[in-house]
Amino acid sequence: CIRDRLERVLAAGGDAAKTVFSGVGKRRDEIERALEAGIRCFNVESFAELELIEQVAGAHGTSAPVSLRVNPDVDARTHPYISTGLKENKFGISIDDALLAYQRAAEAEHIDVLGIDCHIGSQLTEIAPFVDALERVLALADRLAEKGIVLKHLDMGGGLGIRYRDEEPPQPAEHAAALARHLQGRDLEILIEPGRAIAGNAGILLTEVLFLKHHEHRNFAVVDAAMNDLMRPSLYSAWQEIIPLKQRQDESSDTAASVKSYDVVGPVCETGDFLGKDRDLALEQGDILAVRSSGAYGFSMSSNYNTRPRAAEIMVDGDVATVVRERETLLKLMQGEHILPV
C-alpha cells in the first residue's frame, strides 16, 4: 500500500513537501491522503491515473502537483525483475505517448504540471544506461517546451548499484558528473532517489550455524536465518558475501575446521531456501556468519513464511548499538488472526 509508506515517512519525521508519490497502482484514498499531506508531486504512470488524480483534486477543490513518469525504453542491463525502463515493463508512460499525456495534463483544470520522472531500474553498474535515458528524456522536455509546457524539475530516480561481489559500479560522484555534463545550461531542478547506494553495504545479516551436513556430493551449513529473512538470493539468485565472524587461520591443525565448499541454507521447507551456494568456508557448529550487503531490500522484503517471526534490527553508531526494530514475537505474528466460531 503506497499510502502506508507515506504514513511511515511522516511518522519518522519526514517532510511531505520533499516526498514524491510513485507507484503504478495508486488508489483514490491514497491520492486523497497525499493531497491532504501536501506531497511534492505525484509521479503519474498512466493516462487512467492522471484522470483519477484530476477527479480527486477537483472534488477537493485543489490542484494536484504532478510529474509524469516516462518509460524511455532503455535497457538498464540489470536483473530482469528489477529492470523498469523497457517498453515491456509495467512502469511509466511510453515515451512515444508522453507528449499527448503532457498535453492532457496541461489542459486539465486541477493538474499542475511540475516535472518529468524517469527510473529505469535498480542495481545499475554502468553509467551508459543513465545517460541514454537522460538524453531521451531531455529531448522530450525540449519538445514540450516548444509546445509551451515548461518543466520545473527532472527526477532521474535511483538505481545506482553497489558492489556485492566483483561489480565495479560508478561512484556517486561519477554518476552526478555524467548527468551534469548533459544538464548544463538547463533551468531544471534535479531530483535523485538513491536507496540501495546508501543503505545496501551499510547492513549485515547475522546468523548462527545450527548444523553441518556432509553428503557425498554436497556440504550444507544449516543456519537459523532463511529466505524469509533475506529473499534476494532465492528470488534473484543474488550473490552476497558470507563471512564467519571467527576466522580460523591454522586450518592444517588437527582441531581446526577444514575449508569445504558449503551451501548455506535455512530451515524453511523449500529447496530454494538458501543464502549462498558453493562457498568455501571453514565452519563449526555454533559459528556466527555475517551475510554482507544486506542493508537494502533485506528487512523490507522479509516475511513470516513458515510462521517465522522477523528478525530484530540493530543500528550501530560508533560504539553505540541501538535496537531500532524489536524482534517480532509469535504473539505479534498471530495478532489479528481468528478461529471460525463453532
Identify the residue ranges that each predicted region occupies.
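Conserved N-terminal phosphate-binding loop of PLP-dependent enzymes in the Aspartate aminotransferase
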Residues: 171
